[in-house]
């Protein structure tokens, strides 16, 4: 496995737009440390593209931004990217950070059983507050910064 990051950047609603915009801090830090980053942005944040990229690049870290549930992680337009019992094996032996509601409660547990990787996520809803005056420019939202900048530190 090669040192690198694959990161999903869907932006089909306010929540995913915020997550994606604030993820560019993570990408900048990785660039500063000469860590390779493959961005799956917008429509590229889908199951088919994700599976191809993971198999081709074999990077050791995966960062998901998007909605989720206890058994699913969604990409752009809420299309399923990872589904427990279907393709969670792609997470095995990797460092996974999922900013997706409840994805750690079952999917995270299953994907790390008898594996050397880890799954960092949330077993409750992942929530953050925003200043509605900045919906069209999330990076200037000082309220969201309190939540998302600290969330970026995990990666």
Give a label for each model feature:
Residues 60, 94, 117:
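Conserved acidic residues
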Residues 68-92:
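A short, glycine/acidic-enriched catalytic loop
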Residues 43-46, 78-79, 100-104:
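Short beta->alpha connector loops
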Residues 1-65, 97-98:
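A domain-level signal for caspase-like cysteine endopeptidase catalytic cores
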Residues 104-155:
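Active-site-proximal C-terminal subdomain of hydrolase catalytic domains
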């Amino acid at each position: 496995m090669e040192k690198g990051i694959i990161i999903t950047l869907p932006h089909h609603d306010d929540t995913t737009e915020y997550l994606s915009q604030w993820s560019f801090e993570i990408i900048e830090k990785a660039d500063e440390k000469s860590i390779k980053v493959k961005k799956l942005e917008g429509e590229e944040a889908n199951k088919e593209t994700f599976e191809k990229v993971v198999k081709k690049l074999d990077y050791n870290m995966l960062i998901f931004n998007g909605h989720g549930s206890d058994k699913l992680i969604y990409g752009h337009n809420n299309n399923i990217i990872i589904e427990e019992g279907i393709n969670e094996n792609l997470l095995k032996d990797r460092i996974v950070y999922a900013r997706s509601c409840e994805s750690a409660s079952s999917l995270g547990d299953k994907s790390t059983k008898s594996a050397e990787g880890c799954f960092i996520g949330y077993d409750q809803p992942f929530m953050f507050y925003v200043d509605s005056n900045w919906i069209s420019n999330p990076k200037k939202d000082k309220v969201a910064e309190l939540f998302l900048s600290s969330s970026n530190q995990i990666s």
